[in-house]
From Swiss-Prot:
Record protein name field: Proline--tRNA ligase
Any single GO BP term: prolyl-tRNA aminoacylation
Organism: Macrococcus caseolyticus (strain JCSC5402)
The gene coding this protein: proS
Entry keyword annotation includes ATP-binding: yes
SUPFAM superfamilies, sorted: Class II aaRS ABD-related (SSF52954), Class II aaRS and biotin synthetases (SSF55681), YbaK/ProRS associated domain (SSF55826)
GO cellular component: cytosol
Catalyses which reaction(s): tRNA(Pro) + L-proline + ATP = L-prolyl-tRNA(Pro) + AMP + diphosphate
UniProt similarity note: Belongs to the class-II aminoacyl-tRNA synthetase family. ProS type 1 subfamily.
Organism placement in taxonomy: Bacteria, Bacillati, Bacillota, Bacilli, Bacillales
Free-text note on domains in this protein's UniProt record: Consists of three domains: the N-terminal catalytic domain, the editing domain and the C-terminal anticodon-binding domain.
Keywords carried by this UniProt record: Aminoacyl-tRNA synthetase, ATP-binding, Cytoplasm, Ligase, Nucleotide-binding, Protein biosynthesis
Disulfide cysteine pairs (residue numbers): none
Protein role: Catalyzes the attachment of proline to tRNA(Pro) in a two-step reaction: proline is first activated by ATP to form Pro-AMP and then transferred to the acceptor end of tRNA(Pro). As ProRS can inadvertently accommodate and process non-cognate amino acids such as alanine and cysteine, to avoid such errors it has two additional distinct editing activities against alanine. One activity is designated as 'pretransfer' editing and involves the tRNA(Pro)-independent hydrolysis of activated Ala-AMP.
UniProt-listed Enzyme Commission number(s): 6.1.1.15
Stored InterPro entries: aa-tRNA-synt_IIb (IPR002314), aa-tRNA-synth_II (IPR006195), aa-tRNA-synth_II/BPL/LPL (IPR045864), Anticodon-bd (IPR004154), Anticodon-bd_dom_sf (IPR036621), Pro-tRNA-ligase_IIa (IPR002316), Pro-tRNA-synth_IIa_bac-type (IPR004500), Pro-tRNA-Synthase_IIa_type1 (IPR023717)
Amino acid sequence: MKQSKMFIPTLREVPSDADSKSHQLLLKAGMIKQVASGVYSYLPIAKRVLNKIESIVREEMEAIDGVEILMPALQPSELWSESGRWQSYGAELMRMTDRHGREFALGPTHEEIITSLVRDELKSYKKLPVTLFQIQNKFRDEKRPRFGLLRGREFIMKDAYSFHATEASLDETYQDMYNAYSKIFSRLNLQFRPVIADSGAIGGSHTHEFMALAEIGEDTICYTDGSDYAANIEKAEVVYHPNKKHTEENVLEKVHTPGVKTAQQLADFLKRDLDEIVKSMIVKVDDQFVMFLIRGHHELNDIKVKSFFGTEHVEMATDDDIRSILDASPGSLGPVGVNKIDIYADNSVQDLNNLAVGANEDDYHYVNANVDRDFNVKAYGDFRFILEGEPAADGSGPVKFAEGIEIGQVFKLGTKYSESMNATFLNDQGRAEPMIMGCYGIGVSRTLSAVIEQHNDDKGIIWPTAITPYEVHIISVNPKQEVQKNLADQLYDTYRTQYEVLYDDRAERAGVKFNDADLIGIPVRVVVGKQAADGIVEVKNRRTGDAVEVHIDNLQETIQSIYASFES
């Protein structure tokens, strides 16, 4: 393709609102254009890369017998009401009403549509299992779109759904998908980790996220060097080993603590370590308020709270809620004397006695509070985030932390949707049973950004060979000079039958062309310049920056050698 005919509106300056490396490079390289907050047009270079990512995804899906379909983005509310998600999904669901008053959503996922489709068409165990997938635009009304394509309101996604007669069949497809995802991300030359994760609003009993390692990542990955253990910090289990100090219970004492509102301030005031302080917080679970106790150096994990209670409806109580329950401010909460609501405590609180807690009165705290004597705990559990250095759940050693971008996720949905939507099949005994489901997503546009986050330098993008928009970039330094133009034209005509070639034939300064070439990041650059009359060109390896001068008779061999070095 001749660059003079292409649409690549590169920028010289980094846009001020671009808040990640990939966002900056996508804009500077003329690959995307913002239409609205979190909404982008994909320009020719980006579209070529997306096409290649999608091609790899299709190959691996078809290799495990996935069948491609295309479902509507516009989904009627009736189907979402059947599953119960029309009421529960939340503000991220983009809803609308047509001229006839009928309600619709722009789909963030397609569980309802696919379940409706399959329940109407597949009635016998003989037709199962089946796996259907699509690649389509999705929509989510993000409160704060950020990081360009990493958190947008419209995004491209591959979503697949499998239907089964038995759990064993689901297990097999789940593992096939897990392996296929690993192959896809390996082919994209991504550094990634599959991690144990939470299923969120989609639901299900078992799930893994695929995380691309990146400093900009919004998720924290917990892993160890001693095994392949990895978990999203939301799901990383804290293994409790009792370590109770058997000290004498002291007399409960109320202490005046003027201006003390945080656990750290209380620790400083009492001259205690932070881990000896107990924080109290009130949480609304469904329609009930409960109190949670955790040690001062720990943080409450709402995902674990949701899992413990089996609900998606968990939120921190407001200041007004707290005052109506305990007539106290958040900075002075404590369990002593609390009997209106149930009290739950993190496992590690069991190791303490003579606790320092709030007194439910501004500027006062209790010291020497003890469980059973001064207050009752209904249940203990793992309610907190793990800390770096604590033992991993599989016993393989201390956990380490890394940041990651979620680029894919696989779920075992079970019968969550088939039961609520009456998607049944007849088993070999002629009895109706709910289909057992799995669902599997890859953020295609998100993956594009993740690749750029990992593959760049201070000059621009460095594309992995599998998804580079073009394989060879021919640059005519001065197309006004006939010798240079003729040789560049000749090389373009010769090599475009063997490679995907972008030919910069523009009447631009050499510096502009070289800067654009570095920015766009095509792996091999062939520069036709002052030595064109002698048949000499410069060949540059974008990945290493190495450049050599070769005669055009040896150009093919040189290009092949560079690509061979990428493979090794």
